[in-house]
């Protein structure tokens, strides 16, 4: 066997369909588009959601809800995740840089789930009673 004699297996490669190339091809004349109608014409496709001039569904249905300007983008953090942050002081910025919380979070609440294995300093975060006790039990401190 030589590199210049290698060929694909018989039937492994299919010829591209060439439409509009005679009756014998099976795709001659109308080229698989059928007869007449919008879809047979060049450029004959309507936009998504178009219903032929009828008021489309997305405009018939009423608008619903609103986006509150004062919504609280609060992220929840487990106490086990605090240990993943290698900063001396754990605040919102440190949690974002460690990819523990999303970048859009504006407030953080830490709740008890998992162990705090080292002393950490938590600054500017809300903590549940259990999380507060776990951080203090590990020798850490909480700065409001």
UniProtKB/Swiss-Prot annotation:
UniProt keyword list: Ribonucleoprotein, Ribosomal protein, RNA-binding, rRNA-binding
Give the record's GO CC terms: cytosolic large ribosomal subunit
Highest taxon of source = Bacteria
Q: Does the keyword Ribonucleoprotein apply?
A: yes
Pfam families for the chain: Ribosomal_L27A
Q: Which SUPFAM superfamilies does the record associate with it?
A: Ribosomal proteins L15p and L18e (SSF52080)
Give the protein's function.
Binds to the 23S rRNA.
Protein name per Swiss-Prot or TrEMBL: Large ribosomal subunit protein uL15
Organism encoding this protein: Methylobacillus flagellatus (strain ATCC 51484 / DSM 6875 / VKM B-1610 / KT)
Taxonomic lineage is: Bacteria, Pseudomonadati, Pseudomonadota, Betaproteobacteria, Nitrosomonadales
> Which gene does this sequence derive from?
rplO
